[in-house]
From Swiss-Prot:
Cross-referenced NCBIfam families: trpD (TIGR01245)
Species this chain originates from: Lachnospira eligens (strain ATCC 27750 / DSM 3376 / VPI C15-48 / C15-B4)
Entries under InterPro entries matching the protein: Anthranilate_Pribosyl_Tfrase (IPR005940), Glycosyl_Trfase_fam3 (IPR000312), Glycosyl_Trfase_fam3_N_dom (IPR017459), Glycosyl_Trfase_fam3_N_dom_sf (IPR036320), Nuc_phospho_transferase (IPR035902)
SUBUNIT field: Homodimer.
Superkingdom: Bacteria
Source taxonomy: Bacteria, Bacillati, Bacillota, Clostridia, Lachnospirales
SUPFAM superfamilies registered for this protein in UniProt: Nucleoside phosphorylase/phosphoribosyltransferase catalytic domain, Nucleoside phosphorylase/phosphoribosyltransferase N-terminal domain
Enzyme class: transferase
Record's protein name: Anthranilate phosphoribosyltransferase
Length: 335
């Protein structure tokens, strides 16, 4: 099937969901050759992925992941990465704050690919045992409302595309698929994308995949988070109701900063910054974390505004609950 699919893609023809399913099965089982995978991913990227193509591919990747037993509605704050911003680990810190608010968060991530410090690198530098057994992580999620799912542990079939992705060196379908394949089956997602063109399509993909509520976001300074240094494009849905809008930092009382004000560094640097933020340090790095954590609290809650979500996130830091949550996370994963 993959050869026929490549022939369609080079003619700029879309694949049906069934065709994408068949091609992904060939890729995820190691049946397709490296040359075929490279040609397919390049041709698909050049054509542009449709909602149906991404949905079908994500379903196959989910089917091939290691199972994680979870029966709770969980939130994930995640991004496609590859934005080149080398910022602090915003979504990681927001996840800790949101979980301290009593909202279950299953953070799914990996080591750095294009940045200096990925989610896994930051948590490890903070002292979290990132590769705890799935059953242990499931229990931690139940006990303290947060867990970390180390992507390479749960997606063994990704080994069939890792080399090809590095060698062709362009963004491909798999930059989008990874964040769509949380093994805990996140039913709520604050989902950052690397392109404005993906904001609305990815919201519909999440809806197709059974997500109950989500916000897909793109910071207009090319960041896959809600930005403090630019406006942010948003597509939100709760149930079947979709709405698109723009977030401005000033709308929530924040002062717009320069993009470089949000820069991080190596894992040890980002871990130190993370502790400072959770201990109540002020400044743009804390503000951008509050903006994203507040949006996530708003998304996962009923009857509150985003501004109220941000104030709740601020109070969680001020009360010491966020710092305490990190310490519990470290302690529980190292038992």
């Amino acid at each position: 099937m993959i050869k026929e699919a490549i022939a369609k893609l080079v003619k700029k023809e879309d694949l049906t969901a069934g065709q994408m399913n068949d091609v992904m099965e060939e890729i995820m089982t190691g049946e397709a050759t490296d040359a075929q995978k490279a040609a397919f991913l390049t041709a698909l990227a050049a054509k542009g992925e449709t909602i149906d193509e991404i949905t079908a591919a994500a379903r196959v990747l989910r089917a091939h992941c290691e199972k994680f037993l979870n029966d709770m509605d969980v939130l994930e704050i995640v991004g496609t990465g590859g934005d080149g911003s080398n910022s602090i680990n915003i979504s990681t810190l927001a996840s800790i704050i949101v979980s301290a608010a009593g909202i279950p968060v299953a953070k799914h991530g990996n080591r750095a690919a294009s940045s200096k410090c990925g989610t896994a690198d930051c948590l490890e530098a903070l002292g979290v045992k990132i590769d705890a057994a799935p059953a242990r992580m499931a229990q931690i999620l139940k006990d303290i409302n947060i867990c970390f799912l180390f992507a390479q542990k749960y997606h063994p079939a990704m080994r069939f595309v890792g080399g090809v992705r590095k060698e062709i060196g362009i963004r491909t379908l798999f930059n989008i698929l990874g964040p769509l394949a949380n093994p805990a089956g996140a039913s709520m997602q604050l989902f950052g994308v690397y392109s404005e063109e993906l904001v609305e399509p990815l919201a519909h993909v999440l809806h197709n995949l059974g997500c109950k509520r989500a916000m897909t976001i793109y910071g207009m300074d090319s960041i896959d988070e809600i930005s403090l240094s630019a406006d942010t494009k948003v597509c939100e849905f709760k149930g079947d109701e979709f709405k698109s809008y723009t977030i401005k930092p000033e709308d929530f009382g924040f002062t717009r900063c320069k993009k470089e004000d949000l820069a991080g560094g190596e894992p040890a640097v980002n871990a130190r910054i993370a502790r400072d933020i959770l201990e109540g340090a002020e400044g743009p790095k804390t503000d951008v974390v509050l903006l994203n954590a507040g949006a996530a609290i708003y998304l996962a809650s009923d009857g509150i505004t985003m501004k109220e979500g941000i104030e709740k996130a601020r109070e969680i830091i001020k009360s010491g609950a966020a710092k305490k949550q990190l310490e519990r996370f470290i302690e529980e994963t190292n038992k």
